[in-house]
A protein has these predicted regions:
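Surface-exposed, low-complexity loop segments enriched in small/polar and acidic residues
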Residues: 1-96, 112, 156, 160-227, ...
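Amphipathic repeat-derived elements
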Residues: 22-31, 118-124, 129-140, 216-240
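Membrane-embedded beta-strand positions in outer-membrane beta-barrel channels/transporters
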Residues: 39-45, 100-102, 122, 138, ...
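Outer-membrane beta-barrel strand-turn architecture
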Residues: 48-52, 107-113, 143-147, 229, ...
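Surface-exposed extracellular loop regions of Gram-negative outer-membrane beta-barrel proteins
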Residues: 58-72, 93-146, 230-232
Length: 300
């Protein structure tokens, strides 16, 4: 027994609960959380030289940034000794140094097939304490062959480092509803290869009766994450036949690699059993009867 605990008599009737009994039936959670960012920067901009299309200008700068954050749940919540979902602590930080340069280059103006022609150039160097350095560039143009038509385009590189939460988030419990493809509800719709996946995981032929669709799922950050990188291109035009009427048409393409996302529990199960992606099969475990014990959904 817990020292000082006064048991509740659930059959005692109305008015029999004392403050001493209630003192051990509920608690007031004391969570602490915080986020801090320190940022130092210096910027400069101005004109450089006169070109046929106008004045060439620039902008440049340096930046230093430190970000940190934490989430400290109540000790009872952290231990899982409550009727609510457990949650462990989150804490982490990183620092970043950056330098950038931008140029606006007006090449032509008021000449044949060039009412205006402008070029924009930009580059940014970033050095992360936890991911190393990267340089990302951008180039764009605006061209007005005639007064009523604007043609524009851009090409750029992108980089996004994982956030503190995506990296260091503590594990928390949730209970989403999941339909197991290996249960009797779905089993007969599977093909031979999919059924073989179920069998390899200890599920009996024919599937099992899934009595509880709410599966313990642990969600958290991942220190194995790598930065997202991207490359984007756009091309379009704006036609302005009258002063108050514009028609625009734009084409764009964005390629993203190493996308950071947290997959849902159902998606993980389907990818493993239905799609046959082995990596997802390592994110959950089964009991002796084939039922799902628990599932892990971290940022990937």
């Amino acid at each position: 027994a817990i020292a000082g605990c006064v048991p509740i008599n659930l059959t005692g009737g109305v008015g029999t609960l004392t403050p001493e009994m209630l003192g051990f039936s509920t608690f007031v959670a004391h969570d602490e959380y915080g986020y801090k960012m320190q940022q130092y920067f210096a910027n400069i901009s101005g004109d450089i030289v006169e070109l046929p299309g106008g004045m060439m200008s620039f902008a440049a700068g340096l930046e230093h940034r430190v970000e940190s954050g934490f989430d400290s749940p109540d000790a009872l919540i952290n231990s899982g000794n409550t009727t609510g979902n457990a949650r462990t602590a989150t804490e982490g930080q990183y620092s970043l140094n950056e330098a950038y340069l931008e140029l606006a280059v007006p090449l032509l103006k008021d000449v044949f097939l060039a009412e205006s022609l402008e070029l924009s150039l930009a580059t940014r160097y970033s050095d992360y304490s936890n991911f190393g350095s990267t340089t990302n560039n951008k180039i764009g143009f605006k061209w007005k062959p005639i007064d009523t038509l604007l043609v524009r385009g851009n090409w750029s590189e992108g980089f996004r480092a994982p956030s503190i939460n995506e990296l260091y988030q503590g594990v928390s419990d949730s209970y989403p509803q999941v339909t197991d493809p290996c249960s009797t509800t779905v089993y007969n719709t599977l093909n031979a290869d999919q059924k073989a996946v179920c069998t390899s995981q200890g599920v009996q032929v024919g599937g099992y009766e899934q009595s509880n669709p709410q599966i313990l799922t642990q969600v958290g950050g991942s220190l194995t994450l790598t930065p997202e990188t991207s490359e984007s291109s756009t091309l379009g035009f704006v036609w302005s036949p009258t002063q108050n009427f514009d028609i625009s048409l734009d084409w764009w393409k964005i390629d993203i690699e190493n996308t950071i996302t947290a997959y849902g529990a159902q998606f993980i199960m389907d990818q493993c059993v239905v799609e046959g992606v082995d990596n997802f099969c390592t994110l959950f475990s089964r009991g002796p009867g084939g039922e799902i014990d628990s599932l892990l959904s971290t940022n990937l």
